[in-house]
């Protein structure tokens, strides 16, 4: 989010992770120190990756991600099973369908997609319930879900008490970067970081 980076670059170091679906994975090391806090912003599967791979953090802003949404309900598990089966036959078809349901235009990347990593990630979504990890960390967390999300439907979410529900779909932070930045800045202000 370039807009956000312009707002906070003088106070925060911004580090970007890439899970490697369309290019080489990039997981920079995060150093924990007394004088630096680690706040994370995730989207979709990035939330699951974070819960599995980052031991602690000082704050988390999560757009459209869930630790257990995909593993708990049988109809959703069946849908992921279909995606896995179809992905083996025609990855572009599945990705095009996913992006369409996310409200984002799919553009086949110039480089080769990492099909194995994409399939492995679908298995993680289907098979792993990460809620035990999710609640170990008592750091402030803001979950943002979207009213028109066709990937993670609001009606199927279990816990919405402290979560923020906004207008938009699964592609919200990409399609509305200014609104996403406002949510992030507000979270940082509420937690005395700005």
Model-derived segments and spans:
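Short, surface-exposed "cap/lid" segments of acyl-processing enzymes
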Residues: 1-27
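Hydrophobic/aromatic beta-strand patches that form the interior of the parallel beta-sheet core
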Residues: 15, 39, 59-63, 142-144, ...
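Conserved acidic catalytic loop of the alpha/beta-hydrolase fold
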Residues: 23-37
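Gly/Ala-rich beta-loop-alpha elbow adjacent to hydrolase catalytic centers
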Residues: 41-50
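Flexible "cap/lid" loop of the alpha/beta hydrolase fold
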Residues: 55-87, 117-126
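Conserved alpha/beta-hydrolase catalytic His-Asp/Glu region
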Residues: 89-129
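Short beta-strand/loop motif that positions the catalytic acidic residue
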Residues: 137, 143-145, 149
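Catalytic histidine-centered segment of alpha/beta-hydrolase-like enzymes
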Residues: 151, 168-183
